[in-house]
Amino acid sequence: ITAVKKYFIEQMKELVEEEEALAANKGQLPADNALISAKKNGFSDKYLSQIIGVSEDSIRERRIELGVEEAWEGVHVSGTEDSAYYYSTYNAEDKNPVSENKKIMILGGGPNRIGQGIEFDYCCVHAAKALKALGFETIIVNCNPETVSTDYDTSDKLYFEPLTLEDVLSIYKKEKPLGVI
């Protein structure tokens, strides 16, 4: 009826069934194998917290104890050989080298909202330029592909990630910046 391929319908059905199984045990952390599967299938710590009814901190702590942490893959940008442009996954080895340089992490504005101009993005771009001029490695975290801050050459490194606690803490833990703007 919808012309959506059966494969995609089946994948969605499997995710719904996985969510229902997780929600059946409200108030307690899922079994280790269920938590690992949920992370590999794209369930965020925050969403798991909401459907299971336990704190996001509890889920994050258990996930880290199990060694289930984000890895980063490079985005291949047309015309560049080694762009420092990354997205996270729980399904691969980490391919993101980390330097020992002095770094500052800049959090972008995320998705545009009604009434929001580009002023904040302009500030992020100029912060990156000023910090580079001062000798810092600059790291931008943002998820809006229509901003200048997500251009591959604006910062030394770009994480194309949602601005969630899970993602920002994971990047912070990996990069160990001196500060966050």
Question: For each predicted feature, which ranges?
Answer:
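ATP-dependent carboxylate/acyl-activation modules
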Residues: I1-I181
